UniProtKB/Swiss-Prot annotation:
SUPFAM superfamilies: Ta0600-like. NCBIfam families: PRK04330.1. It holds the Pfam family UPF0147. Belongs to the UPF0147 family. InterPro entries: Ta0600-like_sf, UPF0147. It comes from Thermoplasma acidophilum (strain ATCC 25905 / DSM 1728 / JCM 9062 / NBRC 15155 / AMRC-C165). It comes from the Archaea. This is UPF0147 protein Ta0600. Transmembrane segments: none annotated.
Amino acid sequence: MVRVDQNLFNEVMYLLDELSQDITVPKNVRKVAQDSKAKLSQENESLDLRCATVLSMLDEMANDPNVPAHGRTDLYTIISKLEALSKS
């Protein structure tokens, strides 16, 4: 992985960790953030596949009407960084 990619990967992992510990978002969002972090950590699959899987999981949560506005903003931030990571 190129250094820029590694920095972006670390940033995504940090944001997912922050989201998983945010008690102001519903429990299902925190669970998906934890699952997403675990999925991204599995190095036995290609990065593109891991990113696509996590993007799907996060997109489903972003469309949940029970997610507060700030939680949705966090999800969209992570989604955009993941899309950039998968294209690099």
